[in-house]
C-alpha cells in the first residue's frame, strides 16, 4: 500500500476533509494556507489565500460550491470552491475552532474559543440572508459557559449540532432554538474529533483519554469503545465496511527524538462491532492529527504533525478480509 504524499503545508496539519463525491481533498494546517487536492492522484488543484493565522477547520457543502474555513486569526471565511474567491469574512472575538455547513448548504455554524476574556460561542448564519453576513450578526448564538467546544458537527438533516467539549462532555444543541437537547459525558478528557457515519445514524468521537467511542446520533447513546495506549486525535468510519480508523500518538509537545514505533504514530484499524484492532499503517513522522475515509471506502487519508498528508489506496487484500469472530 504505497501512499501518495501531499506536501503543501509548512506546519502541522489540523484537519483534512473530502467533499461528498470524494474527488477533492481539502487540507488545513497551523499555517494560513488552505489547500485543495485531487484525491485520485494527489495533484494540487489550488489554494485559498486570505487567512493570517493557523487554520483550525475546513468544510465543503453538499455540491462542493462553497468552502468554509475557521482560523486563529479570529475569522471564519466563506470561499467559492472553483475560483478561490473569498465570498464572506465573518470576524470573531477569538479563534474559530470548528465550522460546518448544514445538510442543505444554506446555514453555517462555527464555534469560537474561550480565550482573551471572551466566551465560547456557537454562531449560526443563514447564507440566504446577505444582511446577516454584511452586518456580521448571526441569527442565533449559543453561549457555552462551562467548558469550551473542541469539536462539532451538524447532526442528521441539519436539525441539531453535536458538540464535544474540553471536559469530555457531548452536547446536542437544537439548530432551531439553541437549547441543549441531550447531554452525556462518556469521555474523561477532551474530545478532539467527531465524525459521522455515511448515513448519519451514528458518529465516532476521538478523545485525549486514549479512546474513541461510537454513539447514536439522535439519542447520543454510547455503543462501542475502541481503546489505545495513546491520545486519539481523530477517528473516521468506513462508508461501506464495519471498520473505524484511529489516528493519534503522543501529544506534540511530548514528542522528542523517540523512534516512530515508541511514539505509536500508526493509523489503527478497528472492527466496529467487535472493538478489535485488525491492522496498522505506519508512515507519519509524528502524531496523526486528522484521518478521513474516502466516500467510496476504497482509500483513506491521514494528516500529521509532520505537515504531510498521505492518501492510502487499500490493497485488494483489504476488501477480501474476513473478520473471524
UniProtKB/Swiss-Prot annotation:
There is a cross-link at residue 282 (Glycyl lysine isopeptide (Lys-Gly) (interchain with G-Cter in ubiquitin)). The modification Phosphothreonine is found at residue 219. The modification Phosphotyrosine is found at residue 308. One of its GO terms (molecular function) is translation initiation factor activity. Phosphorylated by TGF-beta type II receptor. The keyword Acyltransferase does not apply. Keywords: Acetylation, Cytoplasm, Initiation factor, Isopeptide bond, Phosphoprotein, Protein biosynthesis, Repeat, Ubl conjugation, WD repeat. The keyword Magnesium does not apply. It is found in: Cytoplasm. The modification N6-acetyllysine is found at residue 264. One of its GO terms (biological process) is translational initiation. WD repeats lie at residues 8-47, 50-91, 144-183, 186-225, 283-324. Its main location: cytoplasm. One of its GO terms (cellular component) is eukaryotic translation initiation factor 3 complex. Belongs to the eIF-3 subunit I family. Component of the eukaryotic translation initiation factor 3 (eIF-3) complex, which is required for several steps in the initiation of protein synthesis. The eIF-3 complex associates with the 40S ribosome and facilitates the recruitment of eIF-1, eIF-1A, eIF-2:GTP:methionyl-tRNAi and eIF-5 to form the 43S pre-initiation complex (43S PIC). The eIF-3 complex stimulates mRNA recruitment to the 43S PIC and scanning of the mRNA for AUG recognition. Component of the eukaryotic translation initiation factor 3 (eIF-3) complex, which is composed of 13 subunits: EIF3A, EIF3B, EIF3C, EIF3D, EIF3E, EIF3F, EIF3G, EIF3H, EIF3I, EIF3J, EIF3K, EIF3L and EIF3M. The eIF-3 complex appears to include 3 stable modules: module A is composed of EIF3A, EIF3B, EIF3G and EIF3I; module B is composed of EIF3F, EIF3H, and EIF3M; and module C is composed of EIF3C, EIF3D, EIF3E, EIF3K and EIF3L. EIF3C of module C binds EIF3B of module A and EIF3H of module B, thereby linking the three modules. EIF3J is a labile subunit that binds to the eIF-3 complex via EIF3B. This is Eukaryotic translation initiation factor 3 subunit I. It comes from Mus musculus.
Amino acid at each position: 500500500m504505497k501512499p501518495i504524499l501531499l506536501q503543501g503545508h509548512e506546519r502541522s496539519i489540523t484537519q483534512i476533509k473530502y467533499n461528498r463525491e470524494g474527488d477533492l481533498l481539502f487540507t488545513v494546517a497551523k499555517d494560513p494556507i488552505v489547500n485543495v487536492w485531487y484525491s485520485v492522484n494527489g495533484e494540487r488543484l489550488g489554494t485559498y489565500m486570505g487567512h493570517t493565522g493557523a487554520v483550525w477547520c475546513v468544510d465543503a457543502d453538499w455540491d462542493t460550491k462553497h468552502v468554509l474555513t475557521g482560523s486563529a486569526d479570529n475569522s471564519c471565511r466563506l470561499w467559492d470552491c472553483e475560483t478561490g474567491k473569498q465570498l464572506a469574512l465573518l470576524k470573531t472575538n477569538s479563534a474559530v475552532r470548528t465550522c460546518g455547513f448544514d445538510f442543505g448548504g444554506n446555514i453555517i455554524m462555527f464555534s469560537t474559543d474561550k480565550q482573551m476574556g471572551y466566551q465560547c460561542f456557537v454562531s449560526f448564519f443563514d447564507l440566504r440572508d446577505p444582511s446577516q453576513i454584511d452586518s456580521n450578526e448571526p441569527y442565533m448564538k449559543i453561549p457555552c459557559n462551562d467548558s469550551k467546544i473542541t469539536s462539532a458537527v451538524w447532526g442528521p438533516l441539519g436539525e441539531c449540532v453535536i458538540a464535544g467539549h474540553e471536559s469530555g462532555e457531548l452536547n446536542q444543541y437544537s439548530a432551531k432554538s439553541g437549547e441543549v437537547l441531550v447531554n452525556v459525558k462518556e469521555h474523561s478528557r477532551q474530545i478532539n474529533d467527531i465524525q459521522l457515519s455515511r448515513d448519519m445514524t451514528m458518529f465516532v468521537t476521538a478523545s485525549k483519554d486514549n479512546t474513541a467511542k461510537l454513539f447514536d446520533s439522535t439519542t447520543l447513546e454510547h455503543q462501542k469503545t475502541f481503546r489505545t495506549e495513546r491520545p486519539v486525535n481523530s477517528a473516521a468510519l468506513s462508508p461501506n465496511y464495519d471498520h473505524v480508523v484511529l489516528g493519534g500518538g503522543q501529544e506534540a509537545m511530548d514528542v522528542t527524538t523517540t523512534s516512530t514505533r515508541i511514539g505509536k504514530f500508526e493509523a489503527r484499524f478497528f472492527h466496529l462491532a467487535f472493538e478489535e484492532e485488525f491492522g496498522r499503517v505506519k508512515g507519519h513522522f509524528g502524531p496523526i492529527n486528522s484521518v478521513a475515509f474516502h466516500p467510496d471506502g476504497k482509500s483513506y487519508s491521514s494528516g500529521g504533525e509532520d505537515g504531510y498528508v498521505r492518501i492510502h489506496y487499500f490493497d485488494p487484500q483489504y476488501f477480501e478480509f474476513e473478520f473471524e469472530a
